[in-house]
Amino acid sequence: MEGPEITAAEAVIDNGSFGTRTIRFETGRLAKQAAGSAAVYLDGESFLLSATTAGKSPKDQFDFFPLTVDVEERSYAAGKIPGSFFRREGRPSTEAILTCRLIDRPLRPSFVKGLRNEVQVVVSVMALHPDDAYDVVAINVASLSTQLSGLPFSGPIGGVRIALIDGQWVAFPRYSELERAVFDMVVAGRVVTTADGSQDVAIMMVEAEATEGSWNLIKDQGATAPTEEVVAAGLEAAKPFIAELVRAQAEVAATAAKPTAAFPTFPDYQDDVYQAVFEAASADLTAALQIGGKQDRETRIDEVKEAVKAQLADAFAGREKEVSAAYRSVQKALIRQRVLKDGVRIDGRGLADIRTLSAEVEVLPRVHGSALFERGETQILGVTTLNMLRMEQQLDTLSPVTRKRYMHNYNFPPYSTGETGRVGSPKRREIGHGALAERALVPVLPAREDFPYAIRQVSEALGSNGSTSMGSVCASTLSLLNAGVPLRAAVAGIAMGLISDTVDGETRYAALTDILGAEDAFGDMDFKVAGTKEFVTAIQLDTKLDGIPASVLAGALTQARDARLHILDVMAEAIDAPDEMSPTAPRIITVKVPVDKIGEVIGPKGKMINQIQEDTGADISIEDDGTVFIGAVDGPSAEAARAAVNAIANPTMPEVGERYLGTVVKTTTFGAFVSLMPGKDGLLHISQLRKLSGGKRVDNVEDVVAVGQKVQVEIAEIDPRGKLSLVPVVAEEASAEAAAAEPADA
């Protein structure tokens, strides 16, 4: 029996000292009834299948292209049984939804304009190595299955993840390698022929972020910070990898692709309609587009539109949809020409001007942290909630990440644009915007050990006219600081746009800072950049052009940095350091117990831990390494729970107010470490040593105490991480207390 005829090609990605990755594409074996199907292997360990199918009849009643992308994560791919009640896969995970968006964004603009047949791309993850991510692999296999389907599609499209590790851009990095990365980018593009006949990679989509460990790598280990220049170099570094992936896909398609079928297209309008609308509307529309306020401007634009439709009703009877579409195109052309010729935008701003900014914290009562950030008519409310680490999100996905301490949710109610609509579960767009804001802030969050809280951040888009996602980054920074979260640095975000066209025979580019919603819709690029004063923390780029010159992109990045620094200054006026934690927020402290004592703290069937929680009102959770997190609404309850835990697991654990004759074991520039008992040291700060030097200022610790010296000390404070702060007990204090105690004893 003859087997299926399989067509295959390989792309070999050379990462130098990091080795090679092999991506093998093949078709002809699986899902043969789909219009186009393709499979991909990553190093022979991970396997994805993509199938592209088109509806037989066009949906000519639609005024958009009905493309659907679905990603199916199969638990068997990772050797798991689903954790749901019915033990089968249910709704897609956040990771799957974000992958759908990564695929959709470069695929959608690559179809012929005017296509109205329903197109569905389904990517199934069927085998996955635990150290690999599947999202960029999915972009490539979805591109190939679509290229093979006979649809009018201008692919192939290559997608690559590159990470900056040890100063080198590494393609398709493993999760284990990403621990050493400072920046992580997903870049998608296609190969185009330039004006001089050479080939280049046109970047279509970028999704990038600084990693969770980037701050420590940069500050402590001297790693390269992801500045604008470094990011621009990374985009160039991605191009050869994309070209290799496109080459392999094209090799398969050259043999196995179906001929492009004749699909009916439905252009928005004919040239005669456009010309008539332009002549009838341009004068009034030009004036309407110069109105500053969004609501007033849109009201006037609608009035002009209705007048034009009435004027042309007889000449174009039955072609009302064409008139409306042509009116929108005239509006787009007028906006673009004004920007390129006069350097003036819809609301009268210059190209690099930012709308009026305002920032305010503590806007809601009782919540743990809140802030209101406004940029023009975009208004975002940020709200922070803190809780114990056991409330962090547990993830049942194919990736090795099983929990998430920082959760960012974004809500976009219909009233934010003055419209009615469905309210309920989040749409893909809301999930994507929340994920972008989350990635922008993760690099500056305090370490888990330093701030043992689960953090939920909610961004409410109360008003929308341009980049609510970047407004969410700003509002979230303010809200987190208001909640007392010790961020390593403040983060702000800005949305950039690009308009390009031929003016007087030459191609001109205009980068726009802080774009409006209309500039996003009518422009050629949506480029969101978030970061601190020092480096970039997140980027999202979508472009409708075949490619953006590197110089233009570098200029947009620099323009974005200038805007970001200005916004950070405005935010600093509202709050520039963490506030005291809200009285309604839980107080969380930690204590370390020996691993072999964990069972005693829990007790049979949880008896001991439940009793402590009942007696003190505190919540207690215990990690496998013996770290005990104690959370309570006030300090005394938390301290009572800590004392109860110590009584079981650390019976000799010191408490505040206890005195010891300790031994100096180490001196530093800021104080001396004193051993109170085996394995338990405390810090005697240099400011406290004045008591031992007759009240004189101490500049050198060794002038007062030396290693091996005995010192009488008292425990003044135990910080949330269990570290002890000591104060010296001088002879006069000790004798005075002894004298005061004698009459009581008599």
Swiss-Prot record:
EC number(s) per entry: 2.7.7.8
Biological process, per Gene Ontology: mRNA catabolic process; RNA processing
Major localisation: cytoplasm
Transmembrane segments: none
PANTHER family reported for this sequence: POLYRIBONUCLEOTIDE NUCLEOTIDYLTRANSFERASE, POLYRIBONUCLEOTIDE NUCLEOTIDYLTRANSFERASE 1, MITOCHONDRIAL
Cofactor(s) needed by this chain: Mg(2+)
Family label: Belongs to the polyribonucleotide nucleotidyltransferase family.
Catalytic activity annotation: RNA(n+1) + phosphate = RNA(n) + a ribonucleoside 5'-diphosphate
Single Gene Ontology MF annotation: magnesium ion binding
Protein purpose: Involved in mRNA degradation. Catalyzes the phosphorolysis of single-stranded polyribonucleotides processively in the 3'- to 5'-direction.
Enzyme type, top EC level: transferase
Residues that, per the record, bind Mg(2+): 520, 526
Keyword line: Cytoplasm, Magnesium, Metal-binding, Nucleotidyltransferase, RNA-binding, Transferase
Superkingdom of origin organism: Bacteria
Protein name, entry field: Polyribonucleotide nucleotidyltransferase
Keyword RNA-binding set for record: yes
SUPFAM superfamilies the UniProt entry points to: Eukaryotic type KH-domain (KH-domain type I), Polynucleotide phosphorylase/guanosine pentaphosphate synthase (PNPase/GPSI), domain 3, Ribonuclease PH domain 2-like, Ribosomal protein S5 domain 2-like
Organism, scientific name: Kineococcus radiotolerans (strain ATCC BAA-149 / DSM 14245 / SRS30216)
A UniProt-annotated Pfam family: PNPase
A cellular component annotation (GO) from this entry: cytosol
Compartments it resides in: Cytoplasm
Domain KH: 586-648
Residue stretches making up the S1 motif domain: 657-729
